[in-house]
Amino acid sequence: MKRSFDASHGQLEKQSRPRQVPTSCHFCRTKKLKCDRRFPCSNCRARRLSCVPFSDRSQAASLDLPGAGPSSTVSNEELSENINELKARLQRLEELISVNAEEKLDSKGPTSFVTSKGGYGEDVEASKSMNSLEMDAFEHQPLHSNSEERIAQLFASSFVSIIAPAIRLVIDQPTLSLLPSRKQAERLFDYFADQVVVFYYFIHVPTVRSMLDTVYTHLENKRQPQHDHLALLSTVFALSAYFGSSSSRFPFNGAEAKMLCYRWISVAQQALCAANYIVQPTVETLQSVILIAAYLVPNLGSMSIFRVLMASALQGALQLSLHQIDSPANQRRRQNATVNWVDIESKRRIWWHLASTDWIVSFMSGPRCGTYMIHPKQMTVDLPTNVDDQDIRPAGNYAQPLENAPTDMTFSILRTRISVIFREIVDAATDSGCLQEELPYDVVLAFDHRLHGIMADAPACFRTDPRSSRAPSRSPDLRLHRLIANALNRLHRPYLARGARDPKYSYSRMVCLRTARSVIELCKEMTGANEEFQHVKMWTIVHPLFNSVLVLVMDYCLNREEPRGDERKAEILEGFRLLEACQEDSALAQRGLQQMRQLLKGSASARKDKNPIHGDTDRATPPGSSNLPQHDKSSSSSPAPPVWPCLWTDPDLAPLETMDFDVDLDESQFEVLFRDFEGRHPMY
């Protein structure tokens, strides 16, 4: 029995032994880490531990006991020093953040809707403070600046200053106190619904009006409003203050209106960040961003921010699957189910505004010329229904014929149809392997016919012919004519100079001059017909005005021998006076007017230097005599460099009557000016 016991015991002992001695250290084998088997290994060196081979059981066991050896004591002391150092750094960071936070908080009122339970209040304040610090570092300007240019900078920095805290941010009481009272808010919203929203109608006015009542009920009950709703309403208030500074509805003047606009845009920016509008977009945050991009930012001269905002809105719309609203799967889900048609129509309006804007911008000069981001075959969205907001019914059968009396959505639908033509022009240029300026003339005439067809088929109130029943006081009805006139001008402009020399292209010259003169007349009518709304602040009105004046100047300079020279000068001066009246409220008008003066002034100086005694006015001007860079027409595909530096702080305010239009300029110099100007401000 003893022999059998010893034999079995030996077999068990043999089976329990590993096939080879472990070569990893004790720490790596215990923690199941990959050991590089260099004693000390990298894991132990990083943790400042004693590295002991696993085969040395006795020394490894001593490491498991607290205070078992001097190496363990040294390791604990070093770890304590590291922890103390980290605590000191954290304390210094908290001190810096707390100083910044105390400057922003109002000591008289409640500081936040968030309590300090669980450290959440500190997390919110730290995130907000870091947000402000990062914005200041990014913009290199003090955050308390109240200039209107700060509006664009706020939204530029908002894309790099969003911090993801442990909980969702809230809007503190001092920020909420910047909002107008309920009575003032209702007045501002009524002005927005009457005067502003008609230009780009992608919201549902009754829904936003109900939203206003809900938000102010929450504020009166000391509750935190929904952030995306607050962002949209703050944007509405800001736009009403911006465009209604001359309105009799409001007591504030121009300077106070700018201050209020900046204040409420700042609230909207904070609400958008609190709503996490990039990661978690909603219909309301999309509407807020598009309103700011469409109405405000371009007029302040920040086209790069406009492109960023529109791109972010497009990404948000894709996240919400707005491009598949009417896909077969979604249509099947809506069958025999309760459908919120107001929500469906609002999403259609947002998507088609983004798509039409994308296609129109692709038709204009600039970095986006000839390319668009939204492909029509990659979306399944019906056009918005031609219906007034209050007529949207639960049954879904509320569409109105487009030829009948116009509704809230009529212009938006017509604008979308025009954008489809623009997209097809871009596709035609791509298929032909040429630039838009090089389209065959028969293709240009075909698209010209289609644009005129849209105007002819539009409701009578949108037409400008004498037989139409348009009311002169309803300036928004002129939106369609302005858009088509600028499109025809852009389409025929490459043939403007040739139209005076070759009868084949005389139609293009006639179209350019006729549309330019009609735009100037419409701008005069719009600025004088409605004192409640400052049209000079709409960049989509100032841009066609500048293009029209530039076409008249170009035609005069290239064809000075033609009769009625005094009349042609007079209409040019009239256009300049309109631009001069706009430049105080429009950076676009100021920039365009200064560029035009610089062009004429430089060319006149070159002509006088060439022959100061006899005043030679020969049209044959050497390329080097102009102050503008000359461009080879064969290499028109390369981007045009800047024409000249714009000195905004010192504009040329010489009297218009002293401007010299008898200058020697060629077609390429005007094309450079068109490209430079439209590259900064594409029309849509």
Curated annotation (Swiss-Prot):
Coiled-coil features, chain-numbered ranges: 76-103
Protein function: Transcription factor that regulates the expression of the gene cluster that mediates the biosynthesis of agnestins, dihydroxy-xanthone metabolites.
UniProt keyword annotations, A-Z: Coiled coil, DNA-binding, Metal-binding, Nucleus, Transcription, Transcription regulation, Zinc
Places the protein is found: Nucleus
Encoding gene (name): AgnL11
Source superkingdom: Eukaryota
Organism: Paecilomyces divaricatus (Penicillium divaricatum)
Residue ranges for the DNA-binding region feature of this UniProt entry: 25-51
Signal peptide as annotated in the record: none
Keyword NAD: no
Biased amino acid composition, Basic and acidic residues: 606-619
First-listed, main subcellular location of the protein, grouped into a coarse class: nucleus
Keyword Phosphoprotein assigned: no
One of the record's GO molecular function terms: DNA-binding transcription factor activity, RNA polymerase II-specific
Name this protein carries in UniProt: Agnestins biosynthesis cluster transcription factor AgnL11
Annotated stretches, region: Disordered: 601-644
GO annotation, cellular component aspect: nucleus
Pfam families linked to this entry: Fungal_trans (PF04082), Zn_clus (PF00172)
GO BP annotation list: DNA-templated transcription
InterPro entries in alphabetical order: Sec_Metabolite_Reg (IPR050613), Transcription_factor_dom_fun (IPR007219), Zn2-C6_fun-type_DNA-bd_sf (IPR036864), Zn2Cys6_DnaBD (IPR001138)
